[in-house]
C-alpha cells in the first residue's frame, strides 16, 4: 500500500 499525503514534498 502506498500512502501519498501533502507534506512529503521537500
Curated annotation (Swiss-Prot):
In terms of superkingdom, the source organism counts as: Eukaryota
Cellular component (GO) terms are: extracellular space
Q: Which cysteines are joined by disulfide bonds?
A: none
Localization per Swiss-Prot or TrEMBL: Secreted
Sorted alphabetically, the Gene Ontology BP terms of this entry are: defense response to fungus; innate immune response
Which UniProt keywords are listed? Antimicrobial, Immunity, Innate immunity, Secreted
Keyword Electron transport included in the entry's annotation? no
Q: What does this protein do?
A: Exhibits antifungal activity against Candida sp. but does not possess antibacterial activity. Has no hemolytic activity but may have been derived from hemocyanin.
* The protein's name in its UniProt record: Rondonin
Q: What organism does the UniProt record list as the source?
A: Acanthoscurria rondoniae (Spider)
Kindly list the organism's lineage.
Answer: Eukaryota, Metazoa, Ecdysozoa, Arthropoda, Chelicerata
Amino acid at each position: 500500500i502506498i500512502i501519498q499525503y501533502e507534506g512529503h514534498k521537500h
